[in-house]
């Protein structure tokens, strides 16, 4: 066990990662060494930042806590703290079932952890972070919470109503990250498109993107987690006309069948969804659309699922993720619907949907062979440099594997010609 060392383990989404990075900065300001690697845990203090969104994520968080509890009992770590969405949602149950944890913190009161250790919370460092990502990109959280009332979703239960961060504060944070060498910014929130409605009484995302785009040194801005209902169409010309705003939009649609959209309480119709997607592709030529879909929601019939498959084949999303419905306590669906679709049926539908998407992804990637793209290099591996185009977000999208004919520097941009493609990877060579 290393004295004055803190290990922080982050589970779940990139929004959690930002919270962990801010906590790490506070520990550093108080003289601690911090590490963010689950394979090197030996600190005097270990903090687990949990996810509580759906059953699988909850199970992963609990298993991690139990594993660390065993390490604590063996004397390999000192104090064990838990924070984040799981403990925000199930605090009393966790306190009862996991006595090996020294204290639980929620999603918003984790700042108390510092003072509970007898240390000082530095308010002037509130938005400063220790980056756990490669130094050339960072996630920037522009809001917290959600005002939507989707039937299946526990996020509003955990995080409460939407709270937009002040625009000036976000701009200052980006300037500070640019000064540290960050070039690429993933703008994130549970619902990007709601940004500003609470604080400024208007949809302010287009203005925010313009202001961040104007900052010298910002090479790429990528937008994650838009909501399709009442989409701010003023964003599209910003995306089209500004070179450093990636032609990329991550917008979770969940389904296309009108009966399912109504049961899910999505406040959008099939026709409106098609209109949105067609307008995005028309107004931003070359845009890559990423979406998330759900199968197995209560009430989903075979006809609904077949309609979803036809939709995916028709739209041909460049990027797509999917998951099976999870019956989450406290949600509208939990209170009003029966979780009647067998788990094996959910899994079969999910597997089939992803096989369809794999074929589409293979076609999308194959169409890029022979084209040249501006690529940022993320890292060097044994046989390749690994990079991404503007159409690829870290962790979730395809990467381009670049031959080692020429020495390259991670964090730098290069013109790369695609010479081969697979379903989830491209292969390329740097042009001199």
From Swiss-Prot:
Organism of this sequence: Parabacteroides distasonis (strain ATCC 8503 / DSM 20701 / CIP 104284 / JCM 5825 / NCTC 11152)
Comment on bound cofactor: Binds 2 [4Fe-4S] clusters. One cluster is coordinated with 3 cysteines and an exchangeable S-adenosyl-L-methionine.
InterPro entries: Elp3/MiaA/NifB-like_rSAM (IPR006638), Methylthiotransferase (IPR005839), Methylthiotransferase_CS (IPR020612), Methylthiotransferase_N (IPR013848), Methylthiotransferase_N_sf (IPR038135), NA-bd_OB-fold (IPR012340), Ribosomal_uS12_MeSTrfase_RimO (IPR005840), rSAM (IPR007197)
Stated family: Belongs to the methylthiotransferase family. RimO subfamily.
Record PANTHER family: RIBOSOMAL PROTEIN S12 METHYLTHIOTRANSFERASE RIMO, RIBOSOMAL PROTEIN US12 METHYLTHIOTRANSFERASE RIMO
Function field: Catalyzes the methylthiolation of an aspartic acid residue of ribosomal protein uS12.
Entry's localization field: Cytoplasm
Binding site for [4Fe-4S] cluster 2: 146, 150, 153
Protein name: Ribosomal protein uS12 methylthiotransferase RimO
EC nos: 2.8.4.4
GO cellular component: cytosol
Necessary cofactors: [4Fe-4S] cluster
Gene for this chain: rimO
């Amino acid at each position: 066990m290393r004295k004055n060392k803190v290990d922080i383990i982050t589970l779940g989404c990139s929004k959690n990662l930002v919270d962990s990075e801010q906590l790490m900065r506070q520990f550093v300001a108080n003289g601690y060494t911090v590490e963010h690697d689950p394979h090197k845990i030996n600190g005097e203090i270990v903090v687990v930042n949990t996810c509580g969104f759906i059953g699988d994520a909850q199970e992963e968080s609990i298993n991690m806590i139990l594993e660390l509890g065993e390490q604590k009992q063996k004397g390999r770590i000192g104090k064990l703290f838990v924070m984040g969405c799981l403990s925000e949602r199930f605090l009393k149950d966790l306190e009862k079932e996991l006595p090996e944890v020294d204290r639980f913190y929620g999603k918003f009161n984790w700042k108390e952890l510092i003072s509970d250790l007898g240390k000082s919370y530095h308010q002037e460092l509130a938005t400063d972070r220790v980056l756990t990502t490669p130094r050339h990109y960072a996630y920037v959280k522009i809001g917290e919470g959600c005002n939507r009332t989707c039937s299946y979703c526990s996020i509003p239960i955990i995080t409460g109503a939407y709270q937009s961060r002040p625009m000036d504060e976000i701009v200052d944070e980006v300037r500070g990250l640019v000064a540290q060498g960050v070039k690429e910014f993933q703008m994130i929130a549970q619902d990007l498109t709601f940004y500003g409605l609470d604080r400024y009484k208007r949809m302010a995302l287009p203005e925010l993107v313009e202001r961040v785009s104007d900052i010298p040194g910002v090479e790429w801005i990528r937008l994650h987690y838009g909501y399709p209902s009442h989409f701010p169409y003023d964003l599209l010309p910003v995306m089209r006309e500004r070179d450093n705003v990636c032609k990329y939009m991550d917008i979770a649609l969940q389904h296309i069948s009108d009966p399912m959209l109504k049961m899910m309480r999505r406040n959008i119709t099939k026709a409106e969804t098609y209109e949105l997607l067609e307008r995005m592709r028309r107004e931003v030529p070359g845009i890559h659309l990423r979406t998330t879909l759900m199968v197995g929601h209560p009430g989903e019939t075979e006809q609904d699922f077949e309609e979803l498959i036809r939709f995916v084949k028709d739209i041909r999303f460049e990027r797509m993720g999917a998951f099976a419905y999870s019956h989450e306590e406290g949600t509208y669906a939990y209170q009003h619907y029966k979780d009647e679709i067998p788990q094996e049926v959910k899994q079969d539908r999910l597997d089939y949907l992803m096989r369809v998407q794999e074929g589409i992804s293979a076609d999308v990637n194959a169409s890029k062979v022979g084209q040249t793209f501006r690529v940022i290099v993320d890292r060097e591996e044994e046989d390749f440099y690994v990079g991404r185009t503007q159409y690829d977000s870290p962790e979730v999208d395809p990467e381009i594997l670049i031959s080692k004919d020429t020495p390259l520097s991670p964090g730098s941009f290069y013109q790369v010609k695609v010479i081969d493609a697979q379903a989830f990877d491209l292969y390329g060579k740097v042009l001199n």
